[in-house]
Amino acid sequence: MGVVVYAPASIGNVSVGFDVLGAAVSPVDGTLLGDRVQVKAGTEPFSLNTAGHFVSKLPTDPKENIVYDCWVVFARELDKKGIELKPLEMTLEKNMPIGSGLGSSACSIVAALDALNRFHDQPLNETELLALMGEMEGKISGGIHYDNVAPCYLGGVQLMLEELGIISQEVPCFDEWYWVMAYPGIKVSTAEAREILPSQYRRQDIIAHGRHLAGFIHACHSGQPELAAKMIKDVIAEPYREKLLPGFANARQYAASAGALATGISGSGPTLFSICKQKDVAERVARWLEQNYVQNEEGFVHVCRLDKQGSKVTGSEL
């Protein structure tokens, strides 16, 4: 029997937690904003099919696809446990634009590893699997980080801890918030977005960053949505990355005037997120972004909620 796993889009950083905070989101209208991976019995050790809206952006050689690397490291871990790897056929349905700031690579990695693990009756536990996901993300971006793979896999808002054998833990957030996600249809490379950042920061920025992040986490745990939203500020990346995102400053200004609680860059961009309390405000902001922030037919805007589930089985057939 095959298995199909869907892994949702995620917001790295959530503005206030550079490299240590991430949130999984899914559209309220039921659209699948994420990748799906099917694993079923095959005749050779590994074969790969690709499908989906952004299939043309994938490498033609299966061995250059990150899901092949996922299979390689999964096989390595099974070998350590003395468990036999089943011959399998994998299909990656690529629905996420690459270089979008929506955790596109994390979607493929999480869906592939979760599906591989389920197909083999879950020989790896959650932490072991998450560690592999971080390793794969590091292969793409040059450094192991979990701020997309953790929320994508586990759901909700995740805080990266990486102590006592704990990779990340969920932060209670506000179910009533709408998250408007706007992808303009242009590409920003994570490497370029990293290079633009300063190598050192001023003391007052470090203090502000600590206050905002601590304040946000405190407000989430004590149930203060207004305070939490006020704390969603970024002094680490946004001031420098804004110039890579045409129209971002105007979009943030409009969203605030329309009643949005906070607006920021999703991951390294170019996608932005805008948090709204009321659905009509979210829809008004979404309409404006569709007309003014989206630059071509590849761009899109979705009104989302937090995805509390993370990756999930959607059946056995794509």
Curated annotation (Swiss-Prot):
It is found in: Cytoplasm. Pathway: Amino-acid biosynthesis; L-threonine biosynthesis; L-threonine from L-aspartate: step 4/5. One of its GO terms (molecular function) is homoserine kinase activity. It catalyses: L-homoserine + ATP = O-phospho-L-homoserine + ADP + H(+). It holds the Pfam family GHMP_kinases_N. It comes from the Bacteria. GO terms for biological process: threonine biosynthetic process. Keywords: Amino-acid biosynthesis, ATP-binding, Cytoplasm, Kinase, Nucleotide-binding, Threonine biosynthesis, Transferase. ATP binds at residues 97-107. Catalyzes the ATP-dependent phosphorylation of L-homoserine to L-homoserine phosphate. This is Homoserine kinase. It comes from Vibrio parahaemolyticus serotype O3:K6 (strain RIMD 2210633). The lineage of its organism: Bacteria, Pseudomonadati, Pseudomonadota, Gammaproteobacteria, Vibrionales. The gene is thrB.
